[in-house]
Swiss-Prot record:
Function, in words: DEAD-box RNA helicase possibly involved in RNA degradation. Unwinds dsRNA in both 5'- and 3'-directions, has RNA-dependent ATPase activity.
Short motif DEAD box, span: 150-153
Cystines in this chain: none
Encoding gene per record: cshA
Ranges of residues in domain Helicase ATP-binding: 33-203
Biased composition (Basic residues): 468-480
Cellular localization per UniProt: Cytoplasm
Protein EC: 3.6.4.13
Sequence motif Q motif, residues: 2-30
Protein name per UniProt: DEAD-box ATP-dependent RNA helicase CshA
Length: 506
């Protein structure tokens, strides 16, 4: 494989790349960089995690002219992605004096205006805030020679298609090189390409080892009122390193996050009403392993570039194929394996079939874990935790209590009782989730049927979405089993029947 030097990259940039651990270009970088250096328009179809930031960012650094003034503009769908792209560009150009500025909403515009006045060579921003600066004339386009649209389909999904068109129209076509990257190519993006790009070089890296996500896709059939308990059982059995859980609404995300926390899981939520400061705090916790479960809506998760996500759970099934593709694309990145589990109500199976038909592959049916499997997983987890606890020095007062208990009770029975409380602790916590109606069945035309009842009050005769709430598993009562003081334990309980659950961890 070619190295960066052979692609025409300067020694300074190669040195920066090597210091970052990049010895060889990824497939999309190898295919894109030569054309990008020549000023040719590029249409790249690639997912996050394939090295596409380097595909446009490295040649961008190489083309910087050493004078003040914006020369390159990069559009990104979210603040988080804009910041990530900007940080990578700074790393690529370390020691070369390239100034990179980010502009996005949720932050004081005055500070951004001040930064733009210093004449940065590269600006990375979200469409809305870029337009604000264009209208204020604090961002000038006369010196811009390169325009990048990163995750264009995400920007389209977020309603930025007209904003993208407005911005592209502001930069003279004669001087503009355009590079557009997108995981999918919907018709609106194709129209944008035809209108604003000049015979672009088409580069696809969707089917190579690096960019083809190695994701095991499953669906599990479960009723709404049983969904939360089934979900937490999967969490206990799978033991995900990092997991993203998708809910359909902000309310769902809030309630699901609270329910998980009450059950002892390390979780945080993200949706459109979360402040920018809180978003950054949550993402920092997720990346630093302070939490391992991120609950999010589709909009809130767009543009997130988080490595190491082992599992994606679609707590609520997405309404379209593109949303499904973007959701599960959060795992299985950069050649790593991932697991995606979609929870589906029996009447929503048409949506599973639609996704399968569109993607050309089948999902595997996955039965919910049996109680025996869940308890076994919890026991294994408790064993590991106990080993960690034993390595720590206990407080003297706890040692005193331990001695008193051991003098009073049989040691095996005592430990067994404590472990039982730990293993079954989650079962005693009662949670409440607002009942969400399943998606409507699809008609023959592929659209939801029964639309005439959309505004009717009929709904579900048994559960009204406004007044009824589903409770988490709470039928398991606290054990009333007593143990005799200083008497021998009398064997274990009878094992439950059932097949062994296939633990799909990597």
């Amino acid at each position: 494989m070619q190295n960066f030097k052979e692609l025409g990259i300067s020694d300074n940039t190669v040195q920066s790349l090597e210091s970052m651990g990049f010895k060889e270009p990824t497939p999309i970088q190898k295919d894109s960089i030569p054309y990008a250096l020549q000023g040719i328009d590029i249409l790249g179809q690639a997912q996050t995690g394939t090295g596409k930031t380097g595909a446009f960012g490295i040649p961008l650094i190489e083309k910087v002219v050493w004078k003040q003034g914006v020369q390159s503009l990069i559009l990104a769908p979210t603040r988080e992605l804009a910041m990530q792209v900007a940080e990578q560009l700074r790393e690529f150009s370390r020691g070369q004096g390239v100034q990179v500025v980010t502009v996005f909403g949720g932050m004081p515009i005055e500070r951004q205006i001040k930064a733009l006045k210093k004449g940065p060579q590269i600006v990375v921003g979200t469409p809305g805030r870029v337009i604000d600066h264009l209208n204020r004339r604090t961002l000038k386009t006369d010196g811009i020679h390169t325009l990048i649209l990163d995750e264009a389909d995400e920007m389209m999904n977020m309603g930025f298609i007209d904003d993208m068109r407005f911005i592209m129209d502001k930069i003279p076509a004669v001087q503009r090189q355009t590079m557009l990257f997108s995981a999918t190519m919907p018709k609106a993006i194709q129209a944008l390409v035809q209108q604003f790009m000049k015979s672009p070089k088409i580069i696809k890296t969707m089917n190579n080892e690096m960019s083809d996500p190695q994701i095991e896709e499953f669906y599990t059939i479960v009723k709404e009122l049983e969904k939360f308990d089934t979900f937490t059982n999967f969490l206990d059995v799978h033991q995900p390193e990092l997991a993203i859980v998708f809910g359909r609404t902000k309310r769902r995300v809030d309630e699901l996050t609270s329910a998980l926390i009450s059950k002892g899981y390390k979780a945080e939520g993200l949706h459109g009403d979360i402040t920018q400061a809180k978003r950054l705090e949550v993402l920092k916790k997720f990346k630093n392993d302070q939490i391992n479960i991120l609950v999010a809506t589709d909009v809130a998760a767009r543009g997130l570039d988080i490595s190491g996500v082992s599992h994606v759970y679609n707590f609520d099934i997405p309404q379209d194929t593109e949303s499904y593709t973007h959701r599960i694309g959060r795992t299985g990145r950069a050649g790593k394996e991932g697991i995606a589990v979609t929870f589906v109500n029996p009447i929503e199976m048409d949506y599973i079939r639609q996704i399968e038909d569109a993607n050309g592959r089948k999902m595997s049916a996955l039965r919910p874990p049996h109680r025996k499997e869940v308890l076994q997983a919890r026991e294994d987890d408790i064993k590991e935790k106990v080993e960690n606890w034993m390595s720590k020095e206990s407080e003297s007062r706890l040692k005193r209590i331990s001695t008193e208990l051991l003098n009073e009770y049989n040691d095996v029975d005592l430990v067994a009782a404590l472990l039982q409380e730990l293993v079954e602790a989650n079962d005693e916590v009662e949670v409440q989730l607002t009942f969400e109606k399943p998606l409507s069945r699809k008609g023959r035309n592929g659209k939801p049927s029964g639309s005439r009842n959309r505004n009717s009050k009929r709904g579900n005769p048994k559960f009204d979405s406004k007044s009824k709430r589903s409770k988490g598993y709470s039928s398991k009562k606290k054990s009333t089993k007593k143990f005799d003081r200083k008497e021998k334990s009398s064997g274990g309980s009878r094992p439950m029947k059932g097949r062994t659950f296939a633990d799909h961890q990597k």
